[in-house]
């Protein structure tokens, strides 16, 4: 098999250890959280891996938002933040052997008001809009909680 075919087969088999985290919020700082279907009780913002090594991060962010919530409106903003974290052992089988860390890139998606959400039943069980501090407390992921706690800073910025 040519090396490019091996690379393509490899990327089709394993998740890419680069992802986006999208904090969906209203002007009043209400934040959308969704509950994982594979881990009931685990609440998070929209997140997902790149589909291809060359997929632009904003494209991945919009794709994940649409897939996981059905939301297709709002103003996406790259917060220019990234976190490298250890992949939970329960999910490491999704990545190539030896991959233990993921780099997560944070975006904010400002929506005009609380919007209805259409969940992918395969991925999520429920959704809730919460004030930003309560949303941060409910997140199972420390990096997700930390990103939400920075929301007021990013909403206050022009642009």
How should these model regions be labeled?
Residues 1-26, 96-97:
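Acidic, metal-coordinating catalytic segment for phosphate/diphosphate chemistry
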Residues 17, 45, 100-104:
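Short connector loops at helix/strand junctions that flank enzyme active sites
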Residues 72-83:
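A short coil-to-beta-strand element that immediately follows conserved catalytic motifs
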Residues 83-116, 128:
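Active-site-adjacent beta-strand/loop module that shapes the phosphate/pyrophosphate-binding cleft
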